[in-house]
């Protein structure tokens, strides 16, 4: 099963961009490059996939790896400000904006797991498959990420008072 690349672009482009943007630490251009490179790799990939879910997991895994490679790259020096990207986003409440800002400041290993769990609706088993981690490791990262997020938000809200 290998659906047309255009169909998958329409279906997964925004999700892959969000993941790549998260890993690339707020750099729009790098995130766009990751998404484009991911779909190019899919288009040239010779093997067939069993299910749509297998394709989705493969795309996410490739995007994560490409984004990590970019952030490790020697040439990855200039980054866009969070403020530049924030101008393109709309939030329903000020709290949503604060939450997004705080999640973006978390260490990568927590940020990715939280994003996949809460924004992409993956189960812990699916996340463990995508990231090649044990289910217990995913649960631990979710728990520690939530605790760190809660602690950081408490500090920010106490500072506002």
Q: Would you name each region that the model predicts?
A:
Residues 1-18, 32, 43:
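A short, charge-rich alpha-helical start-of-domain segment used by transcription regulators
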Residues 69, 76-103, 123, 161:
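Internal acidic/polar
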Residues 17, 39, 107, 111, ...:
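C-terminal flanking helix
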Residues 64, 68, 131-155:
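DNA-recognition helix of helix-turn-helix
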Residues 113-117:
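A short pre-motif secondary-structure segment
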Residues 37-54, 74-75:
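Sigma70-family region 2
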Residues 3-5, 81-83, 89, 130, ...:
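C-terminal edge and immediately downstream basic/flexible tail or linker adjoining helix-turn-helix-like DNA-binding
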Residues 48-50, 61-80, 144:
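Arg/Lys-rich amphipathic alpha helix in sigma70-family domain 2
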């Amino acid at each position: 099963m290998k659906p047309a690349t255009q169909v998958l672009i329409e279906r997964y482009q925004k999700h892959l961009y969000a993941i790549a943007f998260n890993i690339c630490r707020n750099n729009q251009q790098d995130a766009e490059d990751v998404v484009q490179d991911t779909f190019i790799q899919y288009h040239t990939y010779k093997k067939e996939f069993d299910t749509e879910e297998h394709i989705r997991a493969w795309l996410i895994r490739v995007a994560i790896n490409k984004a990590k490679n970019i952030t490790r790259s020697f040439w990855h020096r200039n980054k866009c400000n969070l403020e530049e990207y924030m101008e393109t986003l709309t939030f329903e409440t000020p709290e949503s904006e604060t939450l997004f800002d705080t999640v973006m400041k978390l260490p990568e290993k927590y940020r990715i797991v939280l994003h996949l769990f809460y924004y992409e609706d993956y189960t812990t088993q699916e996340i463990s498959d995508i990231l090649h981690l044990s289910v217990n490791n995913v649960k631990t990262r979710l728990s520690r990420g939530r605790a760190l997020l809660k602690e950081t938000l408490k500090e920010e809200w106490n500072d506002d008072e």
